[in-house]
Amino acid sequence: MSSSLPAHNDKSPSRTPRAEAAPADAGDDFIAVLDFGGQYAHLIARRIRHLGVLAKVFPPLAATAELKRARGIVLSGGPRSVYGEDAVPFNPDVLALDMPLLGLCYGHQVVAHHLGGQVRHLDHGEFGKTRLRLRPGDTGPLFEGVPRETEVWMSHGDTVVRAPEGFDVLAETDLTPVAAMRHRTRPVFGMMFHAEVNDTPEGGRILANFVALTGARKTWTMERFIEGALEACRRQVAGRNVLMFLSGGVDSTVAYAPQAPGAQGPAHPGPVPAHRVRGRG
């Protein structure tokens, strides 16, 4: 099945991760996604939200005290090498937190590298649809309901070749001997593939299994998010009027509609001529 998402390339230029928090979510259970600069970090959060659980995106150096409030943590992909001089700064104390943790792609390498495993460079990398083979025996809760052989989406130049002490290898591919692993006594997991993209057909099931493992309450809905965002805007405006410039495009119109006076909002439209939007005047 072809994905409608762009092909992932963890060697693409990195971007500076930013913290993101949905408004009006105080008291809600949430899963933290640490963004190592991969283009799918926010997609991971979106997939979790679609499962009914709030997900928040944080930078890799987010305060441990803040992450302790989460019910689980996912480490995203990223374009760098965990052993390189330009490796994304990361607080390894996160790996000791008492909650389920899942590393995906670069995040998988982070778990392996910081806990004593081995990550090395592949001569040709591993990209695109790849056949994943689960090892015989118990492969743990995240692969529950997943066939012993399945297709996954790989996109990496480095790979994990040796799991850290205390981890069991759960799956392999022709190029990656440690395509998935889990700790024997703690709910810590790593997967070299991208469970969050459409080209991993069983990815949704794997993420759902992880969310279930966290025990997070399913309180997130789009309606609740929208109302929370609007309430946050109202608090920030605090009774003042707001002038919003509209180009007539989808983004500005959608942003304006719920804030319009007819919707009891504070915004007043300021149309922008098309030639100004296109930089012609």
Give the residues covered by each predicted segment.
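RNA-binding accessory domains that recognize and position tRNA/RNA substrates
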Residues: 2-75, 79-84, 95-97, 113-281
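Short alpha-beta junction capping motif
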Residues: 93-104
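Gly/Ala-rich beta-loop-alpha elbow adjacent to hydrolase catalytic centers
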Residues: 103, 107, 112, 248
